[in-house]
Amino acid sequence: MTQKPRMAQASDGRFAPNIQLQHVKTGGFYRVVCLANIEADLAPAYVYESLQTHDFWIRPQAEMEDGRFVVVAKTN
């Protein structure tokens, strides 16, 4: 019997839901929605929203946490 893979939990990531981030290179502001899993390989990834355009984006956890984003505010 194959075990179900462990799914990403919010506590697994550096950035919790609703934290506001700034992209270092572009200066854009974003809000973290959740930590999810990419369907193809179940790798953890962040779902986040642009605070300027309200577009939603998905980025692998490793990229999101490599220094290209910094925390600017913690909201509820």
Task: Specify the residue positions occupied by each region the protein language model found.
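Mixed-charge, Lys/Arg-rich low-complexity intrinsically disordered regions
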Residues: M1-P17
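A short, compositionally biased
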Residues: R14-N18, D41-P44
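A short beta-strand micro-motif
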Residues: I19-V24
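Short solvent-exposed strand/turn elements
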Residues: E39-R59
